[in-house]
Amino acid sequence: MGRSNPVSLFNPFALSTFGFSSIGWIITFAGCIATNTQNNGFPKFAWWAVVFQLLLLIVIVVLYITNTFHYHRFFLTCAIGVAFVYNSNATNNLVYDTSSAPAAASAGFIIQCIVNILWLFYFGSEPSSPIISYIDSFGSSENVMLSSKRSKSNRNAAGQSQIPLDEPYKDETMGYAERNSVSNDNSGLHENPFNTQNYTAQLSGLENASTTNRASALPEDDYPITVRGLFDYDASPDDINELSFKKGDIFRVKDTVGNWWQGKNSKGEIGMCPSNYLEVIG
């Protein structure tokens, strides 16, 4: 469960919107310089809008490269909202000027406002939203927020020691075998050592007891929460405790604590599932 799945650095939505915003910022910066040299009435506060948008672009680049959007989602959404207000105010102060320099600056501010609205909608919405899923479908089908959260889950899971699901049953089975071993030692003097009938019967009883205990230890009431798969997930072949599922599959989980949830599908298969691939529906 500690596999690394880094975010793709070629998300079309992220790259295209960042490219438009960068072009808009360059146009704005050049237009503001030209307007300031030609007109003494240039609104000074527009410079702060230019600087704030530049800082926002730098922050987005850092979060995108380090794949840490999930940690700073609310801060990023608020910062984009502030940048939208600053750019709108600067646009209002420049758009009514008929000269070319203020017109260029206001055009750059308008481009940045449009991109900021798209970012507000994308980062402020839940990744499971149908519209957001549609936007992500044009690229790697990987939402940058989900990918960041999934990487966090994988890092946490890699640093934790995991107890296999079969451990309780293994202890119980070993105890059963030890009791039978003691019994056989006491009665070995009176039985034929080459008679394998009793040994075979003990093994059959042991297997039946293990299967019965497993079924009785996992009643349906232990999985009260219904979830649905947001994306396809293939269990690691190196970890028998993971559970595979497809997008749209509905099954039940034991609880929603931590980054990995213990689930049980309709076939009765039990395993651990990454929480960021699931949506609680009941």
Swiss-Prot record:
Organism this protein belongs to: Ogataea parapolymorpha (strain ATCC 26012 / BCRC 20466 / JCM 22074 / NRRL Y-7560 / DL-1)
Membrane spanning stretches: 13-33, 45-65, 74-96, 103-123
Source superkingdom: Eukaryota
Role according to the record: Plasma membrane osmosensor that activates the high osmolarity glycerol (HOG) MAPK signaling pathway in response to high osmolarity.
Membrane topology: Multi-pass membrane protein
Record note on quaternary structure: Forms homooligomers.
Cytoplasmic-side positions: 1-12, 66-73, 124-282
Annotated ranges, domain SH3: 222-282
GO CC, alphabetical: plasma membrane
Protein name, UniProt field: High osmolarity signaling protein SHO1
Location relative to the cell: Cell membrane
CDD domains per the UniProt record, alphabetical: SH3_Sho1p
Keyword field: Cell membrane, Membrane, SH3 domain, Stress response, Transmembrane, Transmembrane helix
Sequence ranges on the Extracellular membrane side: 34-44, 97-102
Family per similarity comment: Belongs to the SHO1 family.
Pfam name, any one: SH3_1
